[in-house]
């Protein structure tokens, strides 16, 4: 079983947290569960209420379509991770994302906020699909997701 994960983030407010400590916060977790032939089986989507910037930055809204209203009544990150963990199940799976930046963000944000998630321990089987895809195509440089979609 494979799960592709994508995180969307908003910048933090410098008045509330030092940028060097936490530049961004997760505002959405999306995932798709796929079978061995990579056919979609199920989808997961949950909005996450940011703690360190109550306003979705304009550039983030334009990029993601995520509005202030979408996150204002959303759950906080611990509850979102619990929901993702339940959705993932306990059968074990390979986790894929377009780069390692989502895993880095998840670990950094959980560390900063003191969140202990069993799901993070299970994400040792994390795959950087951007790198896998680059190797499959024999490319020297990594591709943006947008460029990869046109291949």
Give residue spans per PLM region.
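Entry/capping segment at the start of metal-dependent catalytic domains
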Residues: 1-37
């Amino acid at each position: 079983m494979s799960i592709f994960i994508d995180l969307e983030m908003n910048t933090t407010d410098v008045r509330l947290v030092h940028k060097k400590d936490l530049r961004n916060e997760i505002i959405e977790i999306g995932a798709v569960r796929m079978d061995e032939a990579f056919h979609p089986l199920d989808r997961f989507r949950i909005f996450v209420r940011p703690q360190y910037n109550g306003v979705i930055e304009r550039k983030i809204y334009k990029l993601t379509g995520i509005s202030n209203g979408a996150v204002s009544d959303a759950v906080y990150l611990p509850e979102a991770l619990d929901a993702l963990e339940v959705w993932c199940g306990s059968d074990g799976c390979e986790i894929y994302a377009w780069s390692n930046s989502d895993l880095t963000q998840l670990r950094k944000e959980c560390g900063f906020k003191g969140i202990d998630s069993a799901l993070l321990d299970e994400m040792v089987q994390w795959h950087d699909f951007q790198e896998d895809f680059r190797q499959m195509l024999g490319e020297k440089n990594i591709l943006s997701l947008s460029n990869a979609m046109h291949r």
